[in-house]
Amino acid sequence: MESPEGAGPGEITKEVKVPQAAPSVPAHETGDTCHTPVAAVEEEVGIPIPAPGFLQVTERRQPLSSVSSLEVHFDLLDLTELTDMSDQELAEVFADSDDENLATESPAGLHPLSRASCLRSPSWTKTRAEQNREKQTPSDPERQGTIVDTFLTVEEPKED
């Protein structure tokens, strides 16, 4: 039997329409291959049904953020409580990046604070002694009047 596309001008092709069971079920037609079941359903129901195998993008939005694999956001490093900070090399990496931030944040004309007079002390550079001191009871007279700050003043040794 010859296909409908190969039919000559003198030949008659018969098109038979198969009744649909439900509007959501695509109809399968025989005969003309140019007429798709999607178009038949769309004409009857009015809702376009996508052809299988195609992805339809209904909405586009901007990405939430973009960070290159080589770039590390400094604020995210503060979330390293689960990291083993007893590793001295790792603590030095964080301390070095903190020094770079202090140098770049200083406005023109002002000198950054010298390392000898003021140290920035984020949570990842605290020593075990400082952590143990913080675990003391709040009734401790030394702890009552102090306020924890991100900058700690370095006291020079007292001369006797």
Swiss-Prot record:
Instruction: List, alphabetically, the InterPro entries matched.
Output: Dysbindin (IPR007531)
**Which GO biological process annotations does it have?**
regulation of signal transduction
Instruction: Name the GO cellular-component terms.
Output: cytoplasm
Where is the PTM Phosphoserine found along the chain?
S3, S97, S121
Keyword set includes Nucleus: no
Q: Which UniProt keywords apply?
A: Phosphoprotein
- Region listing for Disordered, in residue ranges: 1-34, 95-160
Provide ranges: composition bias, Basic and acidic residues.
127-143
Q: Key word Calcium present in the record?
A: no
- Family per UniProt? Belongs to the dysbindin family.
PANTHER family, per this entry?
DYSBINDIN DOMAIN-CONTAINING PROTEIN 1 (PTHR16294:SF4), DYSTROBREVIN BINDING PROTEIN 1 DYSBINDIN (PTHR16294)
The entry's protein name is Dysbindin domain-containing protein 1
Q: Which organism is it from?
A: Rattus norvegicus (Rat)
